[in-house]
Amino acid sequence: MLSAADFDPKPRRASVAVDVGGVIVGGGAPIVVQSMTNTDTADIDSTVAQVAALHRAGSELVRITVDRDESAAAVPKIRERLLRLGMDVPLIGDFHYIGHKLLADHPACAEALAKYRINPGNVGFKDKKDKQFAEIIEMAIRYDKPVRIGVNWGSLDQDLLTALMDENAAAGSPLSARQVTREAIVQSALLSAALAEEIGLPRNRIILSAKVSQVQDLIAVNSMLAERSNHALHLGLTEAGMGSKGIVASSAAMGFVLQHGIGDTIRVSLTPEPNGDRTREVQVAQEILQVMGFRQFVPVVAACPGCGRTTSTVFQELAQNIQNDIRKNMPVWREKYPGVEALNVAVMGCIVNGPGESKHADIGISLPGTGETPAAPVFIDGKKALTLRGPNIAADFEALVVDYIEKRFGRQTAAE
């Protein structure tokens, strides 16, 4: 018979810790949130601005494209500008095709980056593949940088895939093409990691990733990688898509894998709306980790979905205002009020679940539903503290939330 404990997250998979510019990935460290710019890296101003925005939003590592000489030359300048802004955010260089040449030709770039991302599927082809892969690994050893060996099924090593397909065709009970592709993805990562170690890069400088665009495939390849190695793992559903589809797909895929103790760093690869906010992917990554109980980034606002008892929009507007205020103030609150990210706020719309949910929160309000007495009890630390009445209930509650934060979390600052 199953017990309640059977539904808790599985223990984190034991993985080798990797230091990425002072941020620890794996080894039981908190799961790291990362993101990637979509600027032309050679455009220093726009790249610095976007890296800064992503970092302020909570991205602990930021990847930038390094695709040509101009981009490579810009990297140390970008790093310097960020440091002048007080942002010591580790930058990851995303290399494809000519990474070996760019790192060799631009030593300042090689030094400024905190990690190199290598794609085994396009690091080189035929007889040049292992040679050019080795050149990047040797640069990582020279500059003492970790690497992420990032396999992507959109650019999978075709020689390896063809060999496995041929082998499978000759088998007595052949697997499906999809299963063979999954195996090729996993083997590409593991064989590349083994080659990197053979060249001399230690395991504590290697992170692996296997990215696909289908939920079931992501679950499969990362479960296979986790079973066959103890490398730190980077999770991400590539080409997840736009809007709610991308969010749902990424959450479903990574949520399952994380629940099984797999994953040391995550990136949510959302396609932004035209002129949209790139930081949305950081927020979604944080929310995945927070709702699953793995990390705390911002106070949680619980709010009911509404029903026929809540024809007023007051509770919806209040919940939105509080959520927006929290996001806006967190950069300051995080420093001023240590521990504030653990705060739970409830904004409920009627008497059915309102009082109960509010009691479970640190501070909560149960607004009157349709036909109910126009009064809103406020609960603080599980007890009814007061009742708000009148036309300014929402504004009064917002002030109470700020007051609660100052009194509870400000004490720590004052005592230091």
UniProtKB/Swiss-Prot annotation:
The record's section on InterPro entries has: Dihydropteroate_synth-like_sf (IPR011005), IspG_bac (IPR016425), IspG_bac-typ (IPR004588), NO2/SO3_Rdtase_4Fe4S_sf (IPR045854)
Domain of life, per UniProt, equals Bacteria
An example GO BP is: terpenoid biosynthetic process
Cofactor(s) demanded: [4Fe-4S] cluster
Which amino acid positions bind [4Fe-4S] cluster, per UniProt?
C304, C307, C350, E357
Co-factor note (free text): Binds 1 [4Fe-4S] cluster.
**Cited Gene3D superfamilies:** Dihydropteroate synthase-like, Sulfite Reductase Hemoprotein, domain 1
Which keywords has UniProt assigned to this entry?
Answer: 4Fe-4S, Iron, Iron-sulfur, Isoprene biosynthesis, Metal-binding, Oxidoreductase
Q: In which pathway does it act?
A: Isoprenoid biosynthesis; isopentenyl diphosphate biosynthesis via DXP pathway; isopentenyl diphosphate from 1-deoxy-D-xylulose 5-phosphate: step 5/6
A single Gene Ontology MF term assigned here is: iron ion binding
User: Per its UniProt record, what Pfam families does this chain match?
Assistant: GcpE (PF04551)
Reactions accelerated catalytically: (2E)-4-hydroxy-3-methylbut-2-enyl diphosphate + oxidized [flavodoxin] + H2O + 2 H(+) = 2-C-methyl-D-erythritol 2,4-cyclic diphosphate + reduced [flavodoxin]
Enzyme nomenclature, EC number? 1.17.7.3
NCBIfam families per record? ispG_gcpE (TIGR00612), PRK00366.1 (NF001540)
Function of this protein?
Converts 2C-methyl-D-erythritol 2,4-cyclodiphosphate (ME-2,4cPP) into 1-hydroxy-2-methyl-2-(E)-butenyl 4-diphosphate.
Give the family, as the similarity comment puts it: Belongs to the IspG family.
* Name the record gives this protein: 4-hydroxy-3-methylbut-2-en-1-yl diphosphate synthase (flavodoxin)
| Species this protein is from | Rhizobium etli (strain ATCC 51251 / DSM 11541 / JCM 21823 / NBRC 15573 / CFN 42)
Organism lineage string: Bacteria, Pseudomonadati, Pseudomonadota, Alphaproteobacteria, Hyphomicrobiales
Q: Which gene encodes it?
A: ispG
